[in-house]
Amino acid sequence: MVWAPVYWRHYGLQNFLFFCDLGNLFVTAGLWLESPLIFSWQATGLLLFQTLFTIDLVGALASGRHLIGGTEYMFDPHLALWVRLLSLFHVVTPPLLLWAIWRLGHDRQGWKYQTLTAWIVVPINYFWRPEFDVNWARGPFFREQRAVPGLVYLLAYLTLIPALVYFPTHRFLVWLTQRSRAKF
């Protein structure tokens, strides 16, 4: 886990409240414990966003343009290359999660744990060090939104992300595991 002390030094403590960084800690525990719950929990929160990260990174490498956004720091020459390379965990995480769920099975409670995690972590992100906009707690793409009052945005986030990301990802994982089990 070279990643954790390096990130702490370069990015600060608030960085560990990003779902992807929390996910690293949970995935490490999941690997150690071989826990379907931990992998399912993390998959519902990470699969979509880290897949989009990978698409943006590959798109930027291939075309020089960021198709989605979020990987611009990977091309920042002011940040040491070896620190940026540690962020490639975003690319490895989706296949690792899918492999673990294929191997261990999908726990149907995972999306609920991820929702609870969001309900705890995102308000912390909203109120603590708001200038970092961790997990987009104040607005998408690390920009504070101003269309609605901040607390309205926060409540919408805490309702819509579980409904539009976590639950559909859970349903996809249920479908995927049923399909893979039917083949064997």
Pin down the residues of each PLM region.
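Membrane-interface transmembrane-helix boundary segments in multi-pass integral membrane proteins
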Residues: W128-Y166
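Membrane-proximal helix-loop-helix units in multi-pass membrane proteins
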Residues: T44, L48, L52-T117
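Hydrophobic cores of alpha-helical transmembrane segments in multi-pass inner/ER membrane proteins
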Residues: L22-W32, L85-A100, L154-R171
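Membrane-interface capping segments at transmembrane-helix boundaries
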Residues: P168-F184
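Membrane-interface helix caps and helix-loop-helix hairpins in membrane proteins
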Residues: P5-L13, P77-R84
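Hydrophobic, lipid-facing residues on alpha-helical transmembrane segments of integral membrane proteins
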Residues: L47, K112-P123, A156-P168, F172
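Aromatic-anchored segments of alpha-helical transmembrane domains
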Residues: M1-P5, L47-L57, T117-R129
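Loop-to-helix transition at the N-terminal end of transmembrane alpha-helices
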Residues: Y11-L33, L37, Q42
